[in-house]
Amino acid sequence: IRDGGIQELSKMDVIVISVGSLTKNEQRLEELKGSLEAIKSFVPDVVKAGFNGIFVTITNPVDIVTYFVRELSGFSKNRVIGTGTGLDSARLKRILSEVTNIDSQVIQAYMLGEHGDTQIANFSSATIQGVPFLDYMKTHPEQFKGVELSVLEKQVVRTAWDIISGKNCTEFGIGCTCSNLVKAIFHNERRVLPCSAYLDGEYGYSGFYTGVPAIIGSNGVEEILELPLDERERKGFEDACAVMKKYIEVGKSYKIV
């Protein structure tokens, strides 16, 4: 590992943006101005130097920052990706694994929307070893005695803050989430991963980034998968999208672009 200059980045296939300084008492969206000022200081120069690869963004608030990375770079929507709800989805799978005592690798479940407080768990489309999760709950009532899905969802949302309150940062989980995205790009895995992707009609929305499952390959976001949502999930996703739109307007007021 060594330091280098902007010009050397022109040869890279992927650039990971990970600047951030979240404190214990801060919400992710409260980081917005500082994060946008940070990306404005280098993204245009990186593109000017000849970088023609894919940006992967970790920086919070990741959905909003990823939107402005695309605006600053002028790249196509598929070549700017955020980690989004990737880590949150992994946490949901871990929690469901603990409840059911089944390997998380055979559990398919996603958190959708904002990587933040308004994200929602897509229980209605989740599966355990191919069995619809809600059906599995009905046939295994002993495992879910006293378990409320709303509490599990809130547990996912609170996990990051519990970690930050304990050691003042998070690094291993988000590092693994980011490496999965980069690996899928490098090896053209066409793997379905939850990430922050640009909506262009999917789920009935357009013009911003939010957390959804997508096929990731050598071109970045190859395709966004539209999962069925029940009424509660649809309303929650709508609320999360409203937050995205609101803070994009806040970001624009900073005259970043």
Tell what function each PLM region has.
Residues I1-D13, Q27, K245-Y254:
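Conserved N-terminal Rossmann-fold NAD(P) cofactor-binding segment
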Residues Q27-R94:
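Rossmann-like NAD(P)(H) cofactor-binding subdomain of soluble oxidoreductases
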Residues S73-R79, D88-V257:
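C-terminal substrate-binding/catalytic lobe of Rossmann-fold NAD(P)-dependent dehydrogenases
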